[in-house]
UniProtKB/Swiss-Prot annotation:
Coiled coil: none annotated. GO terms for molecular function: rRNA binding; structural constituent of ribosome. This is Large ribosomal subunit protein uL16c. The keyword Ribonucleoprotein applies. It is found in: Plastid, Chloroplast. The lineage of its organism: Eukaryota, Sar, Stramenopiles, Ochrophyta, Bacillariophyta. Its main location: plastid. InterPro entries: Ribosomal_uL16, Ribosomal_uL16_bact-type, Ribosomal_uL16_CS, Ribosomal_uL16_dom, Ribosomal_uL16_sf. Belongs to the universal ribosomal protein uL16 family. It comes from Phaeodactylum tricornutum (strain CCAP 1055/1).
């Protein structure tokens, strides 16, 4: 699973996801991409499940770029613990995804294979997504 090697702080506030993404919303590396249409947190397990789906479907013939990284911690309290006594322990890592964010990019495969692979990966994610194509494919 993806997680940072070290962070400035162990625990973070939840924050709010307002507005659309202004950076990271265009295809930079591959020819095809999967773009988020809703704001959400995507866990490192969900990213890994989608990555495995893409690599299995393309039979490792595609070049894959993961454009999001889970750099925020989510904490959880132990079951049946009393209120108070501080914030819970770190449970898992999430990537904050806003509408317009490119989640995955894929290259070196035909459009039909890329579209099917990214649609299969989209089933593993908790949001609505759309398949996009780079403008200047030569």
């Amino acid at each position: 699973m993806l997680s940072p090697k070290r962070t400035k702080y162990r625990k973070y506030h939840r924050g709010r996801m307002r507005g659309a993404k202004t950076r990271g919303n265009e295809i930079c590396f591959g020819n095809f991409g999967l773009q988020a249409l809703e704001p959400t947190w995507i866990t490192s397990r969900q990213i890994e499940a989608a990555r495995r789906t893409i690599t299995r479907y393309t039979k490792r013939g595609a070049k894959l770029w993961i454009r999001i990284f889970p750099d925020k911690t989510v904490t959880a309290r132990a079951a049946e613990s009393r209120m108070g006594s501080g914030k819970g322990a770190v449970d898992y890592w999430v990537a904050v995804v806003k509408p317009g964010t490119i989640i995955f990019e894929i290259g070196s495969v035909p459009e039909e294979i890329a579209k099917t692979a990214l649609n299969l990966a989209a089933y593993k994610l908790p949001i609505k997504t759309k398949f996009i194509i780079k403008d200047n494919i030569s």
